[in-house]
Amino acid sequence: MAVYIGQASIDENGGIKNGQAGNQSGRELNKSGWYSGGWTLLIRAKDPKTAEKMAKACEDGVANKNIGYDQWQRNTLRAEAKKAGWNLGAIKTPCETDCSAFMAVCAEAAGVNMDVAYTQGNAPATFQMRQQWAKTGKFEMITDKKYLTSADYLKRGDVLVNESRHTVMVLNDGSKAEQIDEKHEANKAKVKSRFELTDATVDWLDTYKYNKDLMEKLANKG
């Protein structure tokens, strides 16, 4: 099964600035088949529900012809997304983004507080994403080559990054994508409720080497 990605690519004139706001060509934001883009980093949401919401936001953004590409106006999408309650499909005012600013807005549309990732209101560029996205505590930073050189292990909602050039959103699972361990997710929820823990604490426990055994013991502790 082919894996598809969503991305902000280039303006209607084949450039990076001074185009007309909105998706004039129909390809400024677009859906494409996965390709080998020299990816150096995979950013994966720790919560599968967040990943799903990010992918849906990306699809809505690509489908909305009021959202175009312009590096000099890259943060205007964020302003309009806020006005639209983070529903990218509901944006009515022509605005602009670029590849990395688009990914950040998709994360915000999924409910992630990305304020810590921004610098004076400017979305992190590709070379800043590893450091800035990590500050939210909501994402894993993955550099295993199997995720970067093939689509097989990718999951819907993953963010692929070439840290010197480009970033895209994965829109469907690869053929060998790990399946969500529903029992483990249920144990995490039970531990959070039982011990009145914050999401951050549960996420920290989940990074422990034997996290699945630990969560099961805590969830079922007598």
Where are these regions (language model features)?
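Loop/turn positions that initiate beta-strands
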Residues: 156-158
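N-terminal capping segments
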Residues: 1-117, 164-165, 177-213, 217
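Interfaces that engage single-stranded nucleic acids at replication/repair/recombination sites
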Residues: 220-222
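Short, basic/aromatic beta-hairpin or loop at an interaction surface
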Residues: 113-141
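Short, well-ordered loop/turn sites that connect or cap secondary structure elements
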Residues: 148, 152-154
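Short beta-strand-centered aromatic/proline hotspots
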Residues: 166-174
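Positively charged
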Residues: 141-148
